[in-house]
């Protein structure tokens, strides 16, 4: 009986933790995505790809277009999240994520995942090509870690930004 109770408490804690991080990720995604319209023209991102960006976390959204990498760079620059070499600025990224409700639960993991993906593609010279690969890697790893939000979660908070 005690073992079942302990197991139940652990399951509830893990579920709350995962839901908490996915919920924070929905806020980060919704806010970050607001800069896309400003960056679309500058990056050469086709309108149809831009329209699909709100579905970034869906399984069938392919993170492959070079222009999407350029748009992500532009969007990141709007929030001053990159260093001069277009790699994430760890401190500024932590601060950005922590600025959202309950952001501290996601900050460390998100920066770690992005940094690990950046290391995998560090040899790609073209910034836009590299960033789109990093974004695809981050999406895959975030899903594996259980911190990726459901599209409905993003839609629920998008009006706040």
UniProtKB/Swiss-Prot annotation:
InterPro entries: Odorant/phero-bd_Lep, PBP/GOBP, PBP_GOBP_sf. Keywords: Disulfide bond, Olfaction, Sensory transduction, Signal, Transport. It holds the Pfam family PBP_GOBP. GO terms for biological process: sensory perception of smell. Olfactory tissue; expressed by the glia-like support cells that ensheathe the sensory neurons and line the base of the sensillum lumen. The keyword Signal applies. GO terms for molecular function: odorant binding. Residues 1-20 form the signal peptide. Disulfide bonds join 39-74, 70-128, 117-137. Belongs to the PBP/GOBP family. Homodimer. Present in the aqueous fluid surrounding olfactory sensory dendrites and are thought to aid in the capture and transport of hydrophobic odorants into and through this fluid. This is General odorant-binding protein 2.
């Amino acid at each position: 009986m005690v073992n079942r109770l302990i197991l139940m408490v652990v399951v509830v804690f893990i579920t709350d933790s995962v839901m908490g991080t996915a919920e924070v990720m929905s806020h980060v995604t919704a806010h970050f995505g607001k800069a896309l319209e400003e960056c679309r023209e500058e990056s050469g991102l086709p309108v149809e790809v831009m329209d699909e960006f709100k579905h970034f976390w869906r399984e069938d959204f392919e993170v492959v277009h070079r222009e999407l990498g350029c748009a992500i760079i532009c969007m990141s620059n709007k929030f001053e999240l990159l260093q001069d070499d277009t790699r994430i600025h760890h401190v500024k990224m932590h601060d950005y994520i922590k600025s959202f409700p309950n952001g501290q639960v996601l900050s460390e993991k998100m920066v770690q995942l992005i940094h690990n993906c950046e290391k995998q593609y560090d040899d790609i010279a073209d910034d836009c090509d590299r960033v789109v690969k990093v974004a695809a890697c981050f999406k895959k790893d975030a899903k594996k870690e259980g911190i990726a939000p459901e599209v409905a979660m993003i839609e629920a908070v998008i009006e706040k930004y």
